[in-house]
Amino acid sequence: MRKIVTIDGPSGVGKGTVAQALARRHGWAYLDSGAVYRLAALFLKRQNLSLAATATQVAALQEMAVDFVMTETVVRVFLNGVAIDDVLRREETGALASQLAVKPEIRAALLDFQRNFAGDAPLIADGRDMGTVVFPEAPLKIFLDATAEIRAERRYKQLIEKGEDVTLAALKKEIAARDARDRNRLVAPLKPASDAVLIDTTDLSVQAVLEKIDALWQAHFFNF
């Protein structure tokens, strides 16, 4: 069985920060599912295609190539060989990705891409349905959560540090809307896998979350 750890949760809960730290610490491959959907949205836009789920869009996505290159401090993301970090994390890109993710045909087109990512290499995968849909066989599944207010505040700090012009009120509204879309969509709604370990990060630092996961890691993979 392939070594896989899935980390799911809502927007702004710290999935990426935690998953990247674990991937660096253990030398595993890293898959950012949220980035895949963001990249798909950007790819379609750059092909002058709408976000509709037609055969044209599904076929176009077969030509999308994604690479995550991990350095000591950041993860560089490449779309068909071109660095895309500058627009990938913008709020408008996230909103487009969330719209795309509710379309069953698009999700199906990207499912095999994610399952085959990095071949048989050990993998850390973060997203919203990694443990429930993409890697239901993963030996260790984690679901991170936090209050919407805390998640908005964390995201606000990140974006301000990057020099983006955002308001906390707007972020709270966007996160509430995204939560509703993600939790209520008919296909792969945001929810913990039945065997996932739930961790509330509202009052926890990143280091505290990593310590909890490391204890679980030892229990699951020490004799794997």
UniProtKB/Swiss-Prot annotation:
One of its GO terms (molecular function) is ATP binding. It catalyses: CMP + ATP = CDP + ADP; dCMP + ATP = dCDP + ADP. It is found in: Cytoplasm. InterPro entries: Cytidylate_kin, Cytidylate_kinase_dom, P-loop_NTPase. Its EC number is 2.7.4.25. Keywords: ATP-binding, Cytoplasm, Kinase, Nucleotide-binding, Transferase. It comes from the Bacteria. One of its GO terms (cellular component) is cytoplasm. One of its GO terms (biological process) is pyrimidine nucleotide metabolic process. ATP binds at G9, P10, S11, G12, V13, G14, K15, G16, T17. Belongs to the cytidylate kinase family. Type 1 subfamily. This is Cytidylate kinase.
